[in-house]
């Protein structure tokens, strides 16, 4: 992850959240509800980085616990 811009890092995180969520068979609504939100807007917007929306560290920690994956998994780039 050398020479990566903040925007590129956000894209990596967004793609990984969506990938791991889908792998666990959860919809955006399922994940949103388990995170304590009443709608999908936070998850759906952050998964596509819509209007500069991103997951914060607290949200990523909660998602990693819900999906039962390592926190650092969100930051891994595919080769």
What are these regions (language model features)?
Residues 21, 32, 64:
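The alpha-helix within a helix-turn-helix
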Residues 67-79:
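Short C-terminal boundary/hinge segments that cap the last helix of small helical domains
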Residues 50-65:
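Short, basic-rich loop-to-helix N-cap that marks the start of a DNA-contacting helix
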Residues 17, 31-32, 42-47, 74:
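Conserved hydrophobic/aromatic packing and binding residues within compact polymer-binding modules
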Residues 1-24:
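A short, Lys/Arg-rich alpha-helix, primarily the initiator
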Residues 18, 29, 61:
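Residues within the helices of the helix-turn-helix
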Residues 22, 36, 48-49, 79:
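Residue-level detection of the helix-turn-helix DNA-binding "recognition helix"
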Residues 37-53:
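Recognition helix of helix-turn-helix/homeodomain-like DNA-binding domains
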């Amino acid at each position: 992850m050398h020479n990566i811009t903040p925007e590129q890092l956000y894209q990596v995180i967004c793609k990984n959240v969506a990938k791991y969520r889908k792998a666990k068979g959860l919809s955006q609504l399922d994940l949103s509800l388990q995170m304590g939100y009443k709608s999908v807007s936070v998850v759906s917007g952050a998964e596509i980085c819509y209007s500069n929306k991103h997951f914060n560290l607290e949200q990523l920690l909660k998602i990693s616990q819900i999906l039962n994956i390592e926190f650092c998994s969100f930051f891994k780039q595919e080769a």
